[in-house]
């Protein structure tokens, strides 16, 4: 049941986030539009994954007390991290652009900020006050078309949080993502370790200061961890079900490539995943059809990769140009 719940939660998070980002790039994002498209994409991912149990070598089911304890750790960690309501984010430099972008998207449904809109009415009338924004640049020299720096998945998550629960949802979004990331870590650990060791590792991560700070104040980091842990767990199950259910590899590829819409440098890791897919499939022996398996994974990854490319080239070209010059 925990595995099925995680498949549902992860695919739901990815589906709604990708729907919101795609519609925001087009300038038509809103709670109704994102809800309809997100639910349709979510349903498609669940159908592609299917309800059949994972085949392949069986692992013993985790004991009930381990699952209960793990869920309790995740719940307590999430509750503790949600209490600050994003105050770490509001006082930290880099995530500030996520906050500004998320607010704009929630209220206007697009990723092009109108430079003529004052954040605080009457601000320009105050003598001696100069305002400047970091992480925002003009588009083609037009001060009324301002780019929001970077990839835009997390501003989308913040916007969805506001649509769902107003300011409370907006401020709670980092902690919710962090709780899902911790749950995905527990899910992956249960596949690789004895259940007691998976629980111990989850507890150690939940109380680690670096983890707590990352969840409360870094934003893109927990999103990558959520996608990464979940994609790895899905990949293990998809390979175990190969070639009976090839569409599971497509779902694993879709989730993994979503990382590209959160951070550009995630591409360095994503490029190595096809190698991992080939190695895992080849271990099944003769007749494993490695090339076909890679094709299914890449087919799933193509959609989010295309959205990430369009997002950067159309809605953050200055940032993309700066990355190119640094490279």
Regions found by a protein language model. Give the residues of each.
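Membrane-interface transmembrane helices that cradle and orient dolichyl/undecaprenyl
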Residues: 231-249, 278-285
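Membrane-interface alpha helices of multi-pass inner-membrane proteins
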Residues: 24, 188, 201-202, 248-264, ...
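Short acidic/glycine- and proline-prone juxtamembrane loop motifs at membrane-interface regions
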Residues: 174, 210-224
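Transmembrane-helix signature of polytopic, membrane-embedded enzymes
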Residues: 4, 168, 185-207, 226, ...
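Interfacial juxtamembrane loops and adjacent helix segments
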Residues: 103-162
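Hydrophobic alpha-helical membrane-interfacial segments at the cytosolic entry of transmembrane helices
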Residues: 67-73, 251-256, 270-274, 285-313, ...
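Membrane-embedded, hydrophobic transmembrane alpha-helices
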Residues: 1-64, 299-327
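Transmembrane-helix motifs of polytopic, lipid-linked glycan transferases
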Residues: 43-50, 169-193, 230
